C-alpha cells in the first residue's frame, strides 16, 4: 500500500469499496479494490480470496489488467487492477440519453466481449456476473470485462447449481434450480447487448416473482428497427430459453455478420515490430550487422563453390545447370548451329561405337520440366535432321530409304550390307518423334527420294524389283498414298499423250523401278482391248478385296470416278486398275 497514493473513492458496495490510486514510481493510475473480510460469511471470504487468485492468473486483452494483490491486516483483500477512464457500460447507457449507439460500435463491443468470454470458457471459468456495471470502457472506448468475485473454476465441462448473480441477468435454468454451465454467461451477455441496443433492461419488473416469470417465459420487447436483422437475430439467439439452443462464444465469433470486426481486431492485436527501447537500438544494430556479415560470407562461399563446381564440370565435359551467365559468356556467344552440330556428332559417334543401350532404352518423351537435364537429353534427337542434311545426297537417300516412316513398298534394305543396315537402324532410332507421330506421314513421303539410277553405291547388276506386300494396315496406307499421287498424275493423262513416262509420274512415283522392260510394261495402250479387259478384271478383283476387308472408304475413292458427270472416268479407273494389278494388289 505504501507504493500507491489514494486519489479518490470511485465506488462503494456491500462487500467493500473501490479507490482510485496512483503508483508513486510509475505515475500511473490504478483502481484499488478493497474487499472487507470482517463480519462476512465464510462463503464471502472464500469468494474474495478466489477473486484475488483468479484475477492474478487471467491474461486477456479484453479483461481488466491485473497489477498486484495482498491481504491487509487480515481484514481486507486488496486487488489492484487497471483503470478504465471511460467508466462502465451502465454509465455510458445513461450518458447516451436515448441516442442509440451505432451498429458498428455495438458489433465491435460484442466481439470483444465474446473474445473475453471465450477465453474464460476455454479455461473452464464461469464469470456468473456478466452485467453492464461490470463491463468497463477504456479511453479508446474498448471493452474490459471485470469483477470476478462470483466467478467459478470448473474442473471440466461440469455444471454448477449455485444461485448467484444479479437477478435481472440470471438465466432461466438458474432460476429453475437446474444445473447450468457456460451458456449462462451467454444469456447474461445477451441481456447486456439488449440493454446496450434498446437503452433499457431486457427484463424489468417491480417484484421478484414477476421478473422470474418474464425470464422463464423469455418475453422480450422488440429491438429498435434501426439495426439490421442479422444483428437483432444475434441478440435473440443469445436469449433463447433452452441453453442447448444458445450458441457458444466461439460459434458467435464465427457468425458472418461479425467476421469483419473479428478480422479487424486480429489485425490490431498483432505484435508491433519496433518494441525495443531506444537504449537497445545500438546493440540490435550491431547484432544485425554481424548477422548480415555472416550471411554474406556464407552466401559468397556458396557462390564460389558453385563456380568452382561448374568449372570442374566444364573441364570434364559435362554441362552444368547451376552455372551463371558470366561463366558461360563464351558459350552463349557461340552460334547455336555449331553447338547442335557438335552435340549431334558426339551422340552419333557414341551410338555407332556401340553405346546403343542408352539411346534405344530411353523412355518416351515426357512433358518438359523446369530443370535443364531433360532438355539436354532431348536435344540430340531434335538436331539430328540438321546433321543429316549436311551428309552427301547419296548417303542421305540410302539412310532415309531404310527408315520405317518411308511408307514405300520397295525393299531398299535388300541392297545394303548388314553393317550399313545396322547403322541405318541406329540412326532411325535417333529420329525425332515429330516425323512419325506429330506430323502426317503422307506429307513426309515426298521428302524421301528414291536413289537415282546412276547411283554409284548401287550394284550395276542389281535391279530394283517390286515385291507384292502383305495385306496390312501399313500397306493399305501406302496404297492409299500411291493412289492419290497416281490420281493427280492421271488427270494430266487425258490432256496429253498417255504413253509419256513423265505424265505417268515416273519421277515422283516410288513404285517405278530402274528396268527399261518394266517401263515398257507400265505403258498402257487404251486401244488394246486385252489390256482394257485385264484392267477391268483387276478393278473388280481389287474392289471385291476392299469390300471383303470392309475398307469402304478406300472402295468409295476407287469407284468415285465412275460417278455421273466425271471427266473420262472410265479411262481413269481402267488405268488405275491396271496400276494396282501391276503392283500385285
From Swiss-Prot:
Q: Tissue range of expression?
A: Expressed in pollen grains.
**Chain residue ranges for the region called Disordered:** 354-413, 489-511
What EC number(s) is this enzyme filed under?
Answer: 2.7.11.1
- A Pfam family (short name) is Pkinase
The protein's matches in SUPFAM superfamilies, at most eight in alphabetical order, are given as:
Protein kinase-like (PK-like) (SSF56112)
Which catalytic residues are annotated? 129 (proton acceptor)
Q: What PANTHER family does this protein map onto?
A: SERINE/THREONINE-PROTEIN KINASE NEK (PTHR43671), SERINE_THREONINE-PROTEIN KINASE NEK3 (PTHR43671:SF71)
Chain's role: May be involved in plant development processes. May function downstream of DCW11 in retrograde signaling from the mitochondria to the nucleus. Seems to be involved in the mechanism of cytoplasmic male sterility (CMS) occurrence.
For this entry, the protein name equals Serine/threonine-protein kinase Nek3
Identify the species of origin: Oryza sativa subsp. japonica (Rice)
Amino acid at each position: 500500500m505504501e507504493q500507491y497514493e489514494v486519489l479518490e473513492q470511485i465506488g462503494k458496495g456491500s462487500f467493500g469499496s473501490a479507490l482510485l490510486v496512483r503508483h508513486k514510481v510509475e505515475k500511473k493510475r490504478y483502481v484499488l479494490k478493497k474487499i472487507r473480510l470482517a463480519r462476512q460469511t465464510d462463503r464471502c471470504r472464500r469468494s474474495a480470496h478466489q477473486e484475488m487468485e483468479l484475477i492474478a492468473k487471467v491474461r486477456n486483452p479484453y479483461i481488466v489488467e491485473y497489477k498486484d494483490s495482498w491481504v491487509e491486516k487480515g481484514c481486507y483483500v486488496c486487488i489492484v487492477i487497471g483503470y478504465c477512464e471511460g467508466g462502465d457500460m451502465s454509465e455510458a447507457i445513461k450518458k447516451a440519453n436515448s441516442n442509440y449507439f451505432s451498429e458498428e460500435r455495438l458489433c465491435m463491443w460484442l466481439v470483444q466481449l465474446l473474445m473475453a468470454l471465450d477465453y474464460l470458457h476455454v479455461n473452464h471459468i464461469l464469470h456468473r456476473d456478466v452485467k453492464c456495471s461490470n463491463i468497463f470502457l477504456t479511453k479508446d472506448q474498448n471493452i474490459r470485462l471485470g469483477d470476478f468475485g462470483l466467478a467459478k473454476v470448473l474442473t471440466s465441462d461440469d455444471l454448477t447449481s449455485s444461485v448467484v448473480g444479479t437477478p435481472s441477468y440470471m438465466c432461466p435454468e438458474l432460476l429453475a434450480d437446474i444445473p447450468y454451465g457456460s451458456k449462462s454467461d451467454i444469456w447474461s451477455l445477451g441481456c447486456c447487448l439488449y440493454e446496450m441496443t434498446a437503452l433499457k433492461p431486457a427484463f424489468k419488473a417491480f417484484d421478484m416473482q414477476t421478473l422470474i416469470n418474464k425470464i422463464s417465459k423469455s418475453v422480450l420487447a422488440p429491438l429498435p428497427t434501426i439495426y439490421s436483422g442479422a444483428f437483432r437475430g444475434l441478440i435473440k439467439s443469445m436469449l433463447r430459453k433452452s441453453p442447448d439452443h444458445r450458441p457458444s462464444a466461439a460459434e458467435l465469433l464465427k457468425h458472418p455478420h461479425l467476421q469483419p470486426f473479428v478480422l479487424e481486431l486480429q489485425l490490431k492485436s498483432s505484435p508491433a515490430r519496433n518494441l525495443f527501447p531506444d537504449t537497445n537500438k545500438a546493440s540490435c544494430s550491431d547484432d544485425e550487422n554481424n548477422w548480415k556479415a555472416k550471411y554474406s560470407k556464407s552466401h559468397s562461399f556458396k557462390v564460389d563453390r558453385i563456380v568452382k563446381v561448374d568449372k570442374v564440370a566444364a573441364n570434364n565435359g559435362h554441362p552444368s545447370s547451376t552455372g551463371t551467365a558470366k561463366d558461360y559468356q563464351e558459350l552463349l556467344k557461340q552460334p547455336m548451329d555449331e553447338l547442335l552440330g557438335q552435340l549431334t556428332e558426339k551422340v552419333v559417334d557414341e551410338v555407332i561405337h556401340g553405346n546403343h543401350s542408352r539411346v534405344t532404352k530411353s523412355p518416351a518423351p515426357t512433358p518438359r520440366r523446369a530443370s535443364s537435364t531433360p532438355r539436354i537429353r532431348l536435344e540430340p534427337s531434335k538436331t539430328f535432321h540438321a546433321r543429316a542434311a549436311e551428309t552427301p545426297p547419296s548417303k542421305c537417300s540410302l539412310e532415309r530409304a531404310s527408315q520405317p516412316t518411308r511408307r514405300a513398298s520397295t525393299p531398299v534394305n535388300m541392297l545394303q550390307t548388314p553393317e550399313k543396315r545396322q547403322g541405318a537402324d541406329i540412326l532411325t532410332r535417333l529420329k525425332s518423334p515429330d516425323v512419325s507421330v506429330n506430323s502426317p506421314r503422307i506429307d513426309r513421303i515426298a521428302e524421301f527420294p528414291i536413289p537415282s539410277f546412276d547411283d554409284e553405291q548401287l550394284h550395276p547388276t542389281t535391279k530394283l524389283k517390286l515385291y507384292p506386300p502383305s495385306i496390312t494396315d501399313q500397306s493399305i496406307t501406302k496404297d492409299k498414298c500411291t493412289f492419290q499421287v497416281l490420281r493427280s498424275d492421271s488427270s494430266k493423262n487425258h490432256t496429253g499423250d498417255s504413253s509419256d513416262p513423265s505424265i505417268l509420274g515416273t519421277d515422283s512415283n516410288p513404285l517405278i523401278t530402274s528396268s527399261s522392260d518394266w517401263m515398257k510394261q507400265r505403258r498402257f495402250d487404251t486401244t488394246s482391248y486385252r489390256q482394257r479387259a485385264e484392267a477391268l478384271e483387276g478393278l473388280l478383283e481389287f474392289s471385291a478385296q476392299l469390300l471383303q476387308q470392309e475398307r469402304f472408304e478406300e472402295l468409295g475413292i476407287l469407284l468415285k470416278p465412275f460417278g455421273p458427270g466425271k471427266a473420262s472416268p472410265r479411262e481413269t479407273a481402267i488405268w488405275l486398275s491396271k496400276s494396282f494389278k501391276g503392283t500385285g494388289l
